[in-house]
Amino acid sequence: MAEQIRVAIAGAGGRMGRQLIAAAAAIPGVTLGAALEREGSGLLGCDAGELAGCGVTGVTVESSLERVAGQFDILIDFTRPEGTMAHLAFCQAHGKAMVIGTTGFSEQEKATIEAASQHVAIVLAANFSVGVNVMLRLLEKAAQVMGSYCDIEILEAHHRHKVDAPSGTALAMGEAIAGALGRSLESCAVYTRLGHTGERAPGSIGFATLRAGDIVGEHTAMFADVGERLEITHKASSRMTFASGAMRAAQWLGAQQPGMYDMCDVLALDTL
């Protein structure tokens, strides 16, 4: 694959799509090859750079991957599960790698993505922020030391338009903690509390969700004991942190063989 990675951005008109276009235009080693929106969108035919507010790029927004198949090496997809799955089928058939930031997949959809990774290289992550992925490693360490005797709660807050809850990042936090404790998240997660719930179940991991205003993303894991409490928090103030991480993932993915990867692989966190 050429040193200059050509990327296509799915969902070009969305909040993340525009940030991804701007990042592709600004980051050395990456070229914006294509931008995509759904059929019937009023944005079709627009210049992608002007749409993102970063100047003319000469790349027009299209509705069909077929029409731009020769213009990109890697598809970056932060859309919705149904759209991502359609894009996945195309990329598998045409040998295109994918960076997937979509969340809310069903177990069957996750299995389909895993199967596709036998044929094309895929980075799948709930969050592309470097800070969040470092936090996941810190949570594993905290859980190993404190998780056996502390109450563990995960709190997350996002903007009013987010459609899935808990966030993919919150679930990844829970999975990191549960894994460090030798448990499955499914066996210990508590997602709702309403009415007379009784005392907190020992060993459970609780989740709390807020949706309000324009919050980009805030996540906190709490390890609470009697007399002290440890909180590990990440706050994102701009979606550009996710977009920059996605470009970093795309650059790394260009040199990889087919397989399923995550941001820990991209950042080589397992070697630290």
UniProtKB/Swiss-Prot annotation:
Query: Where would you find the membrane-spanning parts of this chain?
Result: none
Matches recorded under Gene3D superfamilies: Dihydrodipicolinate Reductase, domain 2, NAD(P)-binding Rossmann-like Domain
Q: Which residues form the active site?
A: 158 (proton donor/acceptor), 162 (proton donor)
Question: What is the top EC class of this enzyme, as a single word?
Answer: oxidoreductase
Q: Which reaction does it catalyse?
A: (S)-2,3,4,5-tetrahydrodipicolinate + NAD(+) + H2O = (2S,4S)-4-hydroxy-2,3,4,5-tetrahydrodipicolinate + NADH + H(+); (S)-2,3,4,5-tetrahydrodipicolinate + NADP(+) + H2O = (2S,4S)-4-hydroxy-2,3,4,5-tetrahydrodipicolinate + NADPH + H(+)
Self-association or partners: how does it assemble?
Answer: Homotetramer.
Q: Which family does it belong to?
A: Belongs to the DapB family.
The protein here is known as 4-hydroxy-tetrahydrodipicolinate reductase
Organism the protein comes from: Edwardsiella ictaluri (strain 93-146)
